[in-house]
Amino acid sequence: VALTTKFDPLFRRYQGRLPVAFLRALAQRESGMNPGSSSASPQAARGLMQITGVARTSYNEANGTSYTPDDMLDPEVSVRIGANLLGRIAGYYAKSAAPNMREDWSNPEFVKLLVAGWNAGYSQGGGVQRVASYLEQRGIPVTHDNVFKHAAAAGAVSYLQDPKRQAWQRSVADLFYAQPDWRDGAGAGILPLLLLGFMAWGAFRISR
């Protein structure tokens, strides 16, 4: 499936550990690659990555910025905030012991769970992490299907009980893996980066 690469320079600039193909697939599903996509409500999702008012406010508070709803129509701002949020979700998931919550772009379950956190909430309060903890306590594998199956029992938000959202999240993962470059550009993840840093520091000390 060939998608436009028009916004790839922005995706590369802000990708962090995220594959460009993933950001491309998400933008396609969110806005059809239309940076002008919006609605009348200031709190509604807007722009290329469909940044919500909640996500915009959270980013402003964390980074000392003052982006307005109209700023979300700037594709660079949209990608910057979107990639930042996705990176935070992946980092939050890394606290879990569940294998499918660990950053692994070759694992469709991780990708679907990441999209679920983006699309339906990721926190311990009522999002994916809450359901993941519930499943882990009961010895149930943390999978995308199981998160939706047990969301109500875990007391999660209604978004994680919506089959249409679940299907949409799957569609993002499917589109990601349909990209010929899906293996390219994914970050090494936290642990490998720490290991590389340690090795580099050791080599520096030995050479002194």
Task: State where each predicted segment sits.
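Secreted/periplasmic proteins that engage bacterial cell-wall peptidoglycan
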Residues: R17-R46, Q50-N63
